[in-house]
């Protein structure tokens, strides 16, 4: 779609450059009966007429008949402004916090006994991981500065991660975890 938009933009700029000094010629109309000869000449003039309409639309977009009858498309600037407004409420440190949380989980997994050492199946390993992560959770401190909500988000993300790991363990069934996964 972006390529299509780019080609339309290129075509518009190209036509503006070519027809900047050109004068529009009136469209020739015939009156009287339509004969095969006049029909052939009419079909030959269609590309010229379309070119003239396109040139008129480009040179005078507010006064052409096409722009008066068709709705104007939204401007890309408006879309960009709306996107910036939507993204204004997003925490910019979100990716950094998620990266740190991921490494914390990996460290917790490394501290758990491996399957060869413990001789347990993957359900018990996931249960140990869930127990370990639930034991290490602390209640977020409430502060008058409003930082409690960001801590709530962090702990919420960790609890979601715990649920995902628990679901993975349940869906795996009797499959064994290998160290290559971690």
From Swiss-Prot:
Localization of this protein: Secreted; Cytoplasmic vesicle, Secretory vesicle, Acrosome lumen
Range of residues in the leader sequence: 1-24
Gene Ontology biological process terms in this record: cell adhesion; negative regulation of cell adhesion; single fertilization
Tissue and organ expression note: Testis-specific. Expressed in zygotene and pachytene spermatocytes, round spermatids, elongating spermatids and spermatozoa (at protein level). Testis-specific.
Top-rank taxon, per record: Eukaryota
Classification via Pfam families: SPACA7 (PF15307)
Location, primary (coarse class): secreted
Glycosylation sites (chain numbering): 40
Keywords: Cytoplasmic vesicle, Fertilization, Glycoprotein, Secreted, Signal
Comp. bias intervals (Basic and acidic residues): 112-140
InterPro entries: SPACA7
GO cellular component, one term: acrosomal lumen
Chain residue ranges for the region called Disordered: 112-154
Function, in words: Involved in fertilization. Seems not to play a direct role in sperm-egg binding or gamete fusion.
Identification of the protein by name: Sperm acrosome-associated protein 7
Organism: Mus musculus
Gene symbol of the encoding locus: Spaca7
């Amino acid at each position: 779609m972006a390529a299509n938009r780019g080609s339309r933009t290129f075509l518009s700029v190209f036509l503006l450059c070519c027809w900047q000094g050109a004068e529009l010629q009136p469209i020739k109309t015939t009156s009287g009966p339509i004969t095969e000869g006049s029909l052939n000449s009419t079909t030959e003039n269609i590309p010229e007429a379309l070119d003239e309409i396109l040139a008129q639309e480009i040179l005078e977009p507010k006064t052409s008949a096409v722009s008066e009858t068709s709705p104007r498309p939204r401007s890309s600037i408006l879309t960009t402004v709306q996107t910036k407004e939507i993204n204004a409420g997003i925490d910019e440190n979100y990716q950094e916090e998620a990266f740190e949380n991921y490494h914390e989980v990996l460290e917790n997994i490394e501290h758990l006994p491996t399957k060869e050492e413990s001789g347990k199946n993957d359900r018990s390993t996931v249960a140990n991981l869930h127990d370990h992560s639930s034991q290490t959770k602390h209640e977020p401190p409430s502060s008058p500065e409003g930082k409690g909500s960001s801590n709530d988000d962090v702990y919420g993300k960790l609890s979601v991660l715990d649920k995902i790991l628990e679901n993975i363990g349940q869906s795996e069934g009797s499959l064994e975890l290998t160290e290559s996964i971690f």
